[in-house]
């Protein structure tokens, strides 16, 4: 049984947010457990619509997001929710080029950042030089960027004519910018198999400014072309070990997108002492305790 031990306070650019330390008899090492949920909702600027409809998603995940399709409505939402939630993820469906159409929300996000306590995490899709310009003007607290390390995956899963080099160039643009950002890698994205993930890690190793590396795992989702895909679990675990060997572990987070039945991935992240896990199982929290770790709860997105 785990009990709330005491409340600490974590500070971020957008204001003061609470962190709960669970069952902490001695300060050994903290592992963060993230519960974004209602305190950190996801917003789609395109509603349920997506022009791209990648094979792993097919716009299904947009159906669970709050549809806010105009800057004015976004500001209204922020005013109404200020003080009630920690912040929100701003995302949406992609254009045929693989971009989330966020530019028209530049002033709205800037206003929210400057006038409310809400933390804003923006999920961009692929970005170029012109996107960096408006994103720096927008000035969100954080950018979440999905890194694709295989051109075959870009073509066959996402369905764009881009290449892995375009994604690596986008990382370089983010690293040279004034923006806080966290790369995300979807393990098993190529129809359940590991393909370009190792190259993505090697690229990230060369960067200087990223906050966290968020590792997630493909969920074979009903209603998508990948609903019957079988994950190469052994290959995914090997990749996670490679990531943990090559990236600072206190920057690696196991993100929310992953099959909940894949318990081994949670146990590995605890054993290897990564920074945190989003919504861990009770068995995983118990393992943290057995490993002498303190579990610190954050009701927000795992990039923070």
Predicted regions span which residues?
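Auxiliary Fe-S-binding modules of radical SAM enzymes
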Residues: 1-22, 28-31, 75, 198, ...
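N-terminal [4Fe-4S]-dependent radical SAM core
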Residues: 2-51, 55-66
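Conserved Radical SAM active-site core
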Residues: 29-31, 36-41, 59-156, 161-180, ...
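Hydrophobic faces of well-ordered beta-strands that scaffold small-molecule active sites
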Residues: 41-43, 88, 120-122, 143-145, ...
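Short, solvent-exposed polar/charged micro-motifs at secondary-structure junctions
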Residues: 41-44, 132-133, 262-267
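Short, small-residue-rich loop/turn micro-motifs
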Residues: 47-49, 147-149, 217-219
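Short beta->alpha linker loops
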Residues: 49, 69, 126-127, 280-283
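Short, flexible active-site loops
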Residues: 180-189, 219-227
